[in-house]
């Protein structure tokens, strides 16, 4: 997910994407805790995508 792609989305769509990613992050954290996580890099990718969305939401709120 690129920041440029996110800037084209509406605030409602960004909030929906953020909610989906937070749910995915929770599931990945549970898999990691139980030792079932196959790709640890997936947790890192989701965390960074969440940060990107929050950054774009903050930028849109400041305008």
Swiss-Prot record:
One of its GO terms (cellular component) is cytosolic large ribosomal subunit. GO terms for biological process: translation. Signal peptide: none annotated. It comes from the Bacteria. Pfam families: Ribosomal_L29 (PF00831). GO terms for molecular function: structural constituent of ribosome. The keyword Zinc-finger does not apply. Transmembrane segments: none annotated. The keyword Cytoplasm does not apply. Keywords: Ribonucleoprotein, Ribosomal protein. InterPro entries: Ribosomal_protein_uL29, Ribosomal_uL29, Ribosomal_uL29_CS, Ribosomal_uL29_sf. Belongs to the universal ribosomal protein uL29 family. This is Large ribosomal subunit protein uL29. It comes from Neisseria meningitidis serogroup B (strain ATCC BAA-335 / MC58). The lineage of its organism: Bacteria, Pseudomonadati, Pseudomonadota, Betaproteobacteria, Neisseriales.
